[in-house]
């Protein structure tokens, strides 16, 4: 599962950028400057909102899809994108027992590290809470869980996601191959 799509995403930062865009739709430069004063990870946050079709950039203009309940709106947008929703759905399944009851989740250290980007995003959105004493995680917002669990994707959406992942993997393989080739040429120029 690709939990890294949530790397450097923090709900308060996302909401701050969204609100700044609402207040300054005609001046993206101002939005960036205001955001950067108190927040971090501007590019990741901006790309995330653009990828979810919450924001659209046209020159220095920012087109914003407006919604009064930002948290629910954001989750709804995430559900529409398999790139984000599949890791989210997979991770949240850990909070469901075999009897279909909500339980606390205590991941092993490897999974905890692997899923840390997504987990930290959920903690920042007050969907999950870390209990330090028992070192487990508690689901705070079960309404979001139900919504995400019920989400489904068309075969076309899943095929497109698989195609995109294959293209990304192929590009990475080509990059590694080229680097190895250059390293070999340093050793022996006749290769």
State the predicted function of each range.
Residues 1-152:
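Donor-sugar nucleotide-binding helix/loop cap in glycosyltransferases
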Residues 33-34, 164, 191:
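Short secondary-structure capping micro-motifs at structural edges
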Residues 154-156:
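Short, charged low-complexity linear segments at domain edges
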Residues 158-175:
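A short, highly charged nucleic-acid-interacting micro-segment common to nuclease
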Residues 174-178, 182:
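Internal, well-ordered alpha-helical scaffold/interface segments
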Residues 182-191:
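A short acidic/basic microdomain associated with nuclease active sites
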